[in-house]
UniProtKB/Swiss-Prot annotation:
<keyword id="KW-0949">S-adenosyl-L-methionine</keyword>
<dbReference type="InterPro" id="IPR041532">
    <property type="entry name" value="RlmI-like_PUA"/>
</dbReference>
<keyword id="KW-0694">RNA-binding</keyword>
<keyword id="KW-0963">Cytoplasm</keyword>
<comment type="similarity">
    <text>Belongs to the methyltransferase superfamily. RlmI family.</text>
</comment>
<feature type="domain" description="PUA">
    <location>
        <begin position="9"/>
        <end position="88"/>
    </location>
</feature>
<dbReference type="InterPro" id="IPR002478">
    <property type="entry name" value="PUA"/>
</dbReference>
<keyword id="KW-0489">Methyltransferase</keyword>
<dbReference type="GO" id="GO:0005737">
    <property type="term" value="C:cytoplasm"/>
</dbReference>
<dbReference type="GO" id="GO:0016434">
    <property type="term" value="F:rRNA (cytosine) methyltransferase activity"/>
</dbReference>
<dbReference type="Pfam" id="PF10672">
    <property type="entry name" value="Methyltrans_SAM"/>
</dbReference>
<dbReference type="InterPro" id="IPR036974">
    <property type="entry name" value="PUA_sf"/>
</dbReference>
<comment type="function">
    <text>Specifically methylates the cytosine at position 1962 (m5C1962) of 23S rRNA.</text>
</comment>
<keyword id="KW-0698">rRNA processing</keyword>
<dbReference type="InterPro" id="IPR029063">
    <property type="entry name" value="SAM-dependent_MTases_sf"/>
</dbReference>
<protein>
    <recommendedName>
        <fullName>Ribosomal RNA large subunit methyltransferase I</fullName>
        <ecNumber>2.1.1.191</ecNumber>
    </recommendedName>
</protein>
<dbReference type="InterPro" id="IPR015947">
    <property type="entry name" value="PUA-like_sf"/>
</dbReference>
Amino acid sequence: MTESTFPQYPRLILSKGREKSLLRRHPWVFSGAVSRLEGKANLGETIDIVDHQGKWLARGAWSPASQIRARVWTFDKAESIDIAFFTRRLRQAQQWRDWLAKKDGLDSYRLIAGESDGLPGVTIDRFGHFLVLQLLSAGAEYQRAALISALQTCYPDCAIYDRSDVAVRKKEGMALTQGPVTGELPPALLPIEEYGMKLLVDIQGGHKTGYYLDQRDSRLATRRYVENQRVLNCFSYTGGFAVSALMGGCRQVVSVDTSQDALDIARQNVELNQLDLSKAEFVRDDVFKLLRAYREHGEKFDVIIMDPPKFVENKSQLMGACRGYKDINMLAIQLLNPGGILLTFSCSGLMTSDLFQKIIADAAIDAGRDVQFIEQFRQAADHPVIATYPEGLYLKGFACRVM
């Protein structure tokens, strides 16, 4: 397609000097950078982004009610946003996942990781022959039909299920959606394989898209720390860390979560892998309260896994989140035997690795214990981070030896 045959997109004109982030290929335009919109654009519609002199910078999606006024689809002026565009992006992403799946023997992985795969607001996880779709931005929702058409072209044998039932959609004025898009309905629990483990995934009712694929490598790493150890698995969800700990030869693993449904699946996962169920305990409780109760009763563990949900959604919550992370890690440190291992994580994108490390250090000081950092974790390689979008590195973790 020649430039003269392109659709005439509305133009988002930036204020003078506010083009620097786009020149560095960052995919977001914030409200404070916007001078005006020239032409009319509906929510999520494609727009051209230009500097104050009219020089073309990028092509993106318009979101007038969001702090992020535009999310960039492409920095290539010759690229239109259509089915062919999404097909190219999908095939480019699949090349990397094919290599990973073959190398690690995976049947489930993140196929599209939003901005880092050039599709802002789009998350797609693959579980066997099911593609689970989350559209998290107005632009992604506006392009729903084109994206689904591209998915059907690239994956004709896969069923597509929509899990766009996340609260973040409300920030851009979108309703929550969930249900089958094409093909069969996922079973209530779908078995997948991960580094020798068989795990049941609840696509329809589970957290996010059903399972935390981003912690795959951290679950595997757990095995080298747990042989003959007593393990406490906090915020256990469906027991991926617990199964991995049992496969690593732990003496006992106690899994704690507030959801009985998740704990029931965790128990099934232990049984599915034919592991010793007598070594696994499942406790429905609030982790903060239980850790304090354990401290009062003198309970001790050799390894503690701390994988809490996101504590911070925006900058205004960061201080409170820091206190939460500090308190819970302090409690964990107090419960560890000398020489014990704390595997602790944060999935909050606003929490940098440096800040998280400082929080753990402060928690150790408050606990009156010395801590050595011995290993660092991040999201699995099917969740890549593009260099121009450091916000994509949201999951970070540390293995700490507590003296």
